[in-house]
């Protein structure tokens, strides 16, 4: 099993026991697969932007989504864009490239993302975006690193020389993401 698949399996397995509230539905009786080939298919797609949701699975009491994200180079000294997600935790597993991930702290000019946008409807639910004034934490990240970002915590990348690409596993206790979603390139 390659490193990407092993990392994804480990993160999903750990999160499958995540605490939840609200609904009390029965979890699925079968596992959901996302193969290394699936990840590469979505990564290599010519369209789809920097945040590409692969699947959203209804786990009963909560949803879990898995996406792959890519951030391009940042300009030294440029303002750092900050985003938070009101309901969804994100677990990043870096698969290639590197950069500095900023989290928490203070943000200027925060505004809600459009409710009808794909990022809100499919990827992360209600979210806000602004510019970092002062981050609470900074850390260099590269292949193999995992970072867990709670709901409401602003985050963004800087010091990206070429790119940073990562898998994001998103526990969704409020069912704001569309259960059953499958990236169009992965529908069989």
State the predicted function of each range.
Residues 86-101, 105, 114-129:
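Short, conserved beta-strand element in jelly-roll/cupin
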Residues 162-180:
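A short hydrophobic beta-strand segment most commonly corresponding to one strand
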Residues 20-86, 181-188:
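A short, N-terminal "cap"/entry segment at the start of jelly-roll beta-barrel domains
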Residues 10-19:
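Hydrophobic h-region of N-terminal signal peptides that target proteins for export
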Residues 132-136:
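Short alpha-helix capping/helix-loop boundary micro-motifs
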Residues 1-8:
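Bacterial N-terminal signal peptides that target proteins for export
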Residues 82-83, 89-93, 138-139, 146-147:
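His/acidic/aromatic-lined binding-pocket segments of jelly-roll/cupin-type domains
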Residues 139-161:
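Conserved metal-binding segment of the jelly-roll/cupin
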């Amino acid at each position: 099993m390659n490193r990407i698949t092993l990392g994804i399996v480990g993160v999903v397995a750990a999160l499958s026991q995540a605490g939840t509230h609200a609904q009390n539905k029965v979890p699925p009786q079968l596992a959901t697969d996302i193969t290394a080939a699936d990840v590469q298919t979505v990564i290599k797609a010519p369209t789809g932007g920097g945040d590409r949701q692969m699947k959203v699975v209804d786990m009963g009491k909560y949803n879990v989504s898995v996406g792959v994200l890519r951030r391009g180079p940042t300009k030294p000294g440029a303002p750092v864009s900050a985003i938070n997600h009101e309901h969804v935790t994100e677990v990043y597993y870096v698969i290639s490239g590197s950069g500095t991930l900023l989290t928490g702290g203070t943000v200027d000019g925060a505004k809600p993302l459009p409710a009808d946008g794909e990022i809100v409807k499919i990827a992360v639910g209600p979210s806000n975006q602004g510019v970092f004034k002062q981050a609470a934490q900074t850390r260099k990240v590269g292949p193999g690193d995992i970072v867990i970002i709670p709901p409401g915590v602003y985050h963004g990348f800087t010091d990206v020389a070429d790119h940073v690409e990562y898998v994001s596993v998103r526990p969704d206790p409020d069912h704001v993401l569309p259960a059953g979603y499958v990236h169009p390139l992965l529908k069989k």
